[in-house]
Amino acid sequence: MKRLLCLLLAVLTACFCAGCGWMDGSYVSVKPHQVGYSQSSGDITSVDGPAGLRKAVTGLIDSGKTEAIMTLSGYPEAQARSDMEKVITYCIQSYPIGAYAVEEIRYEIGQGLLLLQIEYRKSKAQIDRIQSVRGNSGAQEAIVKALSNCADSLVLQVTLYSEMDVVQYIADYAAENPDVVMELPQVTVQIYPQSGNTRIIELEFSYQNSREKLREMLSQVRQIFSSARLYVTGDADDSMKLSQLYSFLMERFDYVIQTSITPAYSLLNYGVGDSRAFAQVYAAMCRQSGLEAMTVSGTCNGESRFWNIVRDGENYYHVDLLECAQLGRLRKKTDAEMTGYVWDYSAYPACAGEPETVQTEPEN
């Protein structure tokens, strides 16, 4: 209010010097705001109707401006007041950046002038950091980049927006890319406004490890994945590559079966991991070496279990690294051989190849 009155005083002074008076206007009620910063528009804008008024106000919001003077060129003041109320409602409830950033809009109208003040709950720097992307695919690319950088926040303006489960997408990406996401963050999502083809998505990522520590982990894990790719013979067949990657991973440690919040890092650097960590890391190493591999979620003898389905030549097989560790070798199994296992059969390819021939030592 104080700033608006100061602006009004300046205009009154100008009007007095020009030999004109000022008529009483009106303004909307003011709520306490969290963030205020001063940046006036500098120029006087002329508006002559509701379309121009909306364009002028949204332009101020896009620029993070807090104050403006507008002349009402042939625009009846009573109509301007009515239209201004509609513009305020639109900007705060429906206009994406306004719904995200604006706390309150106040105004005075009189003698053919409109004085405007905008108060924000987001800082100018926060508004400037909004990234514009197109569609959900563009949003996903930006999210992946933020995860790779261990960022703590991300704000996107998404055109051609369609509903998407951001939290689930992040979880799925982390599972598919254990060499990129060291720790699955807690994710808070806010979307502004609640409808429309263009939305602001505000994401906050919360990690238990510091950004510096996560980046250190990422560097070490990427080096190990690079070593795994070099370990594989380039012209070998699928069966040989699968065996080589199995040896690379399983011969690193005498593993301790335990869950960690940094699955790939703990598994590859300290030999600590659970079935999920083994399956996700092995699948990622296989894919990076040109093999088809996926992680399966199910149960084994009634307990939660993760394992892999891999492609060997023309056939798919199950590989449970925890079972392989007990056997001391890579074991590929068909669906029929998966006694005690339960999974969503419709979500994965059938493993109906020839059962693996197991070599046995001849009896004396």
Residue ranges of predicted features:
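Hydrophobic helical h-region of N-terminal Sec-dependent signal peptides
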Residues: 9-14
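Periplasmic OmpA-like peptidoglycan-binding domain that tethers envelope proteins to the cell wall
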Residues: 267-276
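N-terminal accessory/pre-domain segments preceding catalytic cores
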Residues: 21-234, 345-364
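C-terminal motif of bacterial Sec signal peptides marking the signal peptidase cleavage site
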Residues: 15-19
